[in-house]
């Protein structure tokens, strides 16, 4: 059983990322549980998605420790995961990138917002880059046609290209392009560098 938490603020794509991934997993034959915890009154309020999936029936969808935590904001406290993927600046108190030696080898720091803006023209595509990276770390490698089938109709082509970009971040040329375009360093885990995407 795999457990993923997506953490952010309202308007950061938490629901789109998690729902797209959940629909994809269902189409791939997995049992899926997706639970949301969010403040519906305020844009910018806490937004969490708890996603559990397995080939067998899911008895308990509660997540104490996730396999992967995608952290797009610092709003949520006390979340634990084996691997955490931070939006750049969230792992430090001053909002700047952490020193490479201060980031555990299982964790990653990626400037999703800047990549979305600089490479695809809108910050919202950074969330699809995050989805692509999440798919690699979770070892979800469906054919492109399966991914396209669950993408929102609006900006389908741009979203697909952003997901592919996220899936290929472990490739040196792709990583370098991302760093040049965003002006920020990208730190990937060894685990993520070894994954191959389709």
Which functions belong to the PLM regions below?
Residues 1-198:
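Active-site cofactor/cluster-binding pocket
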